[in-house]
Amino acid sequence: RSQQESLGVVGVNLIYGAFYQHDRPRKMLRYLFDHIDKSAIEIDTINFTGPLFEDVDNRILSLELVKNGMTEAVMFGPDGNNLLPARVLYKKNILAIRGSFRPVTNVNMDMFTSSSSLFYQDEDVEEDNTMNIFEITLSNLRSNGTGFIDEQDFMDRAKLLCAMGLTVMISNFKEYYRL
């Protein structure tokens, strides 16, 4: 199938979802890929706004995108709003710290401080053109012993990192080099 056809199907599914599934945003997300293969298109970010979605936290829906294999990674900024990774990372120096951040510890922050000071010593790296990312993988989110993701635990970590003024990435990258 061509990319145009796939986008057309996603568009029709989105319109259908807006009319008939607006009260169930998670279900609406899954319906976006009805009648197309997940490898045909990737949804990098999603943002539900408006009076019908006041109780929806877009960070949870971003997590759903990664969990359902619709994208490999999602990001949100210190304000808790979703970010489009391609837009915010384009032509940036990237310093990524991977961890579970359950909770954020002094060791995590010391690693970040030490690595950033080393990173900025490179003459090609400009601090104001650098994006610092705290990455949590799906594996880290599932490491609670049950194999399932505890959404309240995820939200607690996300809120803590955002309150610290940090940019958060949730990814399905098992290997660090893929990040």
Please give the residue ranges for each predicted region:
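Nucleotidyltransferase catalytic core that binds NTPs
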Residues: 1-179
